[in-house]
């Protein structure tokens, strides 16, 4: 054991570096070859008169900013309350600091020099645009950083703070009438482009990724023309949620006029008439009122505002528009299953004829489409359908970038028999199984090694194939089409 060599190796890591606003100091991760910079500001606090505005630039600071701890999470319902599946799985700390001043990001890097130019992952968390934060255990970027990428997790405003619309907002700031959370994500990406070289990252090799609402956020960023040239690849995990049996999709952006009416109703519920009054209220009072409001009204999320979001990002992808980059997307096997509601075979035939017209017989010729469950007939993953439809459309419209589909179907242990539930794949992509309460065993860790290696290869090259980090050749993963 050579203590001097260990100390020398630690000194060779990037523990301190500069950003456009000042110096930052990180902290060694559990693996001393990795430096974690937590709570790095990328925009000014969206508080006071900056509430419900596009993110503004940070002010410069003197000295060295200590970035050893995570910054407060964005204002939302208090995490960690109750014994639901997701509280048990992720939101385990009801005392986690929370503040409207929340526009910070976190960086994990194993670079030894600012000249390393490592590929970069920019991650957006999920939570239905209502909840979620970067300090969730599963998003620890250390394991991925060990494989030679720089990992960045971006915090953003959620719920009413991130997605309020109102006629007064549209009139006062037509350049940014809504989608403040999406603009936070975009500002985080732009900060990475400008600053990540000082953390050993390559600003010309950035993959954006996210899960659930984070995956839908990736779709929104790909649809934004202003991001042209900033994104070299994308991963959408469980973020395209549709159904072959319905005309509408879950999470389709809200038209501005509809969103403005929801905002007007909320102001009335809040007991205010003007933006000035609303901006003067305490953030936690607004949060609590919004939670009550959402019991009987639609929640606030992405809006077709004509500026950041000009149309449905999924529709744009189907038509071969938006940023065309290598794309990986998929789903877990037990999430968002859709069914045909029918009580027997006769009613199934009638429903099939309504849905598929002259192709009903062809649909029913597949035995799996006659399968009946307690929820109905013909169970199918709405996400799998949506992803494959998008991939086929990309190909048909002339996109020459590869599309890689995955279906995550691991056995998930635990007394709750939760199945392959929505979000369980996050432990595997980030290879953070050891942080979870579930009794994962050796074959789960082997699977996580393979999955994270596919993910890292994709970040590095736009192609998941190659070797895992132990230099074992991975099974070939062919493009979907």
Question: Where in the sequence are the language-model features?
Answer:
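Active-site rim elements
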Residues: 91-95, 174-179, 246-254, 369-383, ...
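Mobile gating loops/cap/lid regions near enzyme active sites that modulate substrate access
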Residues: 80-81, 389-481
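Non-catalytic accessory segments of hydrolases
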Residues: 12-179, 203, 296, 440-451, ...
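Alpha/beta-hydrolase active-site loop
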Residues: 175-197, 257-261
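Short, Lys/Arg-enriched N-terminal segments with co-localized hydrophobic residues
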Residues: 1-12
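Glycine-rich nucleophile elbow surrounding the catalytic serine of serine-hydrolase chemistry
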Residues: 210-220
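Substrate-access "cap/lid" subdomains that shape
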Residues: 194, 220-223, 228, 233, ...
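Alpha/beta-hydrolase fold nucleophile elbow
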Residues: 200-211
């Amino acid at each position: 054991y050579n203590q001097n060599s260990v100390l020398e190796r630690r000194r060779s890591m990037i523990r301190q570096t500069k950003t456009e606003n000042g110096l930052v100091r990180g902290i060694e991760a559990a693996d001393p070859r990795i430096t974690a910079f937590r709570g790095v500001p990328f925009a000014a606090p969206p508080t006071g008169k900056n509430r419900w505005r596009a993110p503004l630039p940070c002010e410069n600071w003197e000295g060295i900013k200590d970035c050893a701890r995570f910054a407060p999470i964005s204002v939302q319902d208090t995490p960690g309350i109750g014994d639901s599946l997701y509280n048990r799985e992720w939101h385990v700390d009801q005392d986690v600091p929370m503040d409207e001043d929340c526009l910070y990001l976190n960086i994990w890097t194993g670079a030894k020099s600012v000249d390393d130019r490592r590929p970069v992952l920019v991650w957006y968390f999920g939570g239905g645009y209502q909840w979620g934060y970067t300090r969730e255990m599963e998003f620890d970027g250390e394991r991925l950083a060990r494989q030679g990428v720089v990992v960045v997790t971006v915090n953003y405003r959620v719920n009413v703070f991130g997605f309020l619309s109102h006629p007064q907002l549209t009139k006062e700031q037509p350049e940014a009438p809504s989608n403040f959370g999406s603009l936070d994500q975009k500002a985080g990406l732009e900060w990475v482009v400008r600053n990540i070289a000082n953390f050993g990252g390559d600003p010309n090799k950035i993959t954006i990724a996210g899960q659930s609402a984070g995956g839908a956020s990736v779709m929104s960023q790909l649809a934004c023309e202003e991001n042209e040239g900033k994104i070299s690849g994308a991963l959408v995990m469980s973020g395209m949620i549709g159904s072959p049996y319905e005309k509408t999709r879950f999470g389709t952006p809200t038209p501005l006029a509809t969103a403005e009416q929801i905002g007007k109703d909320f102001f009335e519920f809040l007991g205010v008439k003007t933006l000035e009054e609303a901006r003067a209220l305490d953030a936690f009072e607004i949060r609590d009122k919004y939670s009550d409001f959402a019991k009987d009204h639609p929640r606030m999320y992405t809006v077709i505002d004509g500026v950041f979001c000009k149309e449905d990002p999924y529709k744009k992808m189907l038509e071969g528009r938006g940023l065309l980059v290598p794309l990986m997307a998929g789903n877990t096997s037990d999430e968002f299953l859709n069914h045909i509601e029918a009580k027997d075979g006769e009613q199934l035939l009638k429903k099939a004829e309504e849905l598929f017209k002259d192709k009903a017989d062809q649909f029913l010729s597949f035995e799996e489409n006659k399968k009946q469950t307690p929820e109905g007939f013909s169970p199918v993953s709405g996400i799998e359908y949506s992803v494959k439809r998008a991939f086929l459309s990309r190909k048909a419209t002339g996109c020459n970038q590869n599309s890689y589909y995955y279906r995550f179907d691991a056995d998930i242990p635990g007394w709750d028999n939760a199945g392959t539930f929505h979000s369980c794949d996050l432990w595997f992509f980030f290879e953070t199984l050891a942080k979870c309460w579930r009794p994962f065993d050796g074959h789960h860790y082997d699977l996580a090694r393979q999955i994270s290696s596919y993910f890292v290869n994709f970040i590095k090259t736009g192609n998941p194939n190659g070797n895992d980090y132990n230099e074992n050749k991975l099974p070939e993963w062919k493009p979907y089409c």
